[in-house]
From Swiss-Prot:
Function recorded in the entry: F(1)F(0) ATP synthase produces ATP from ADP in the presence of a proton or sodium gradient. F-type ATPases consist of two structural domains, F(1) containing the extramembraneous catalytic core and F(0) containing the membrane proton channel, linked together by a central stalk and a peripheral stalk. During catalysis, ATP synthesis in the catalytic domain of F(1) is coupled via a rotary mechanism of the central stalk subunits to proton translocation. This protein is part of the stalk that links CF(0) to CF(1). It either transmits conformational changes from CF(0) to CF(1) or is implicated in proton conduction.
Superkingdom: Bacteria
Key words of the record: ATP synthesis, Cell membrane, CF(1), Hydrogen ion transport, Ion transport, Membrane, Transport
Gene3D superfamilies in UniProt: N-terminal domain of the delta subunit of the F1F0-ATP synthase
Family annotation (Pfam families): OSCP
Protein name: ATP synthase subunit delta
UniProt subcellular location: Cell membrane
Organism expressing this protein natively: Streptococcus uberis (strain ATCC BAA-854 / 0140J)
Subunit structure: F-type ATPases have 2 components, F(1) - the catalytic core - and F(0) - the membrane proton channel. F(1) has five subunits: alpha(3), beta(3), gamma(1), delta(1), epsilon(1). F(0) has three main subunits: a(1), b(2) and c(10-14). The alpha and beta chains form an alternating ring which encloses part of the gamma chain. F(1) is attached to F(0) by a central stalk formed by the gamma and epsilon chains, while a peripheral stalk is formed by the delta and b chains.
Family membership: Belongs to the ATPase delta chain family.
Length: 178
């Protein structure tokens, strides 16, 4: 991705978030963006929009389908994206919108990777640790199961990581022996 495209993505995302703040629409925007991103991932629409194999008119029609379940501000945003033929950047724009909202509200999604599923009590403890350690509010708790970490967990939030996995501890021990 070029610097120009990154700048465009940032500008579009910031503009949408600024409108949402001005209109007191931030939480609804966040829900709309999550829904659209999930739809795009599930249908591979993100790959279709960035592919040169599809005609621009076909891409525009697919983006218009997303407007059916969205708010008026998101629909206006999608219209601007289509008018400027930037649909190939839409997926990244929406991900950047979520990052902008997180920064604005100091609320971040927390990703927890563990070898086995966490209980509700463990999830609550993870949330309280994140809130106290990083001084932020938690959004969604995204749980990932990865048996290769053997035990412990890896918490990742706002580009910061707490890794207490057995796999990392064994790796650290191995490096000390070498």
């Amino acid at each position: 991705m070029t610097k120009k495209e990154l700048a465009l993505i940032e500008q579009y995302a910031k503009s949408l978030v600024e409108v949402a703040i001005e209109k007191d629409f931030l939480n609804a925007l966040k829900e709309d963006v999550y829904a659209i991103l999930e739809t795009m991932k599930a249908s591979n629409l993100d790959k279709i929009l960035s592919s040169l194999a599809y005609a621009p008119d076909d891409k525009a029609n697919l983006v218009r389908l997303l407007k059916d379940s969205s708010s008026v501000y998101v629909n206006n945003f999608l219209d601007v994206v289509l008018q400027n033929q930037r649909e190939y950047l839409l997926f990244d724009m929406l991900k950047t919108v979520l990052k902008e909202i997180a920064q604005e509200t100091n609320t971040y999604d927390v990703t927890v990777t563990s070898a086995i599923p966490l209980t509700e009590e463990q999830k609550n403890r993870v949330i309280s640790v994140v809130m106290s350690k990083f001084g932020i509010q938690t959004g969604r708790l995204i749980e990932t199961i990865d048996a290769s970490i053997i035990g412990g967990f890896i918490i990742s939030v706002n580009n910061q990581v707490i890794d207490t996995s057995i796999k990392r501890q064994l790796h650290d021990f191995k490096m000390k022996l070498i």
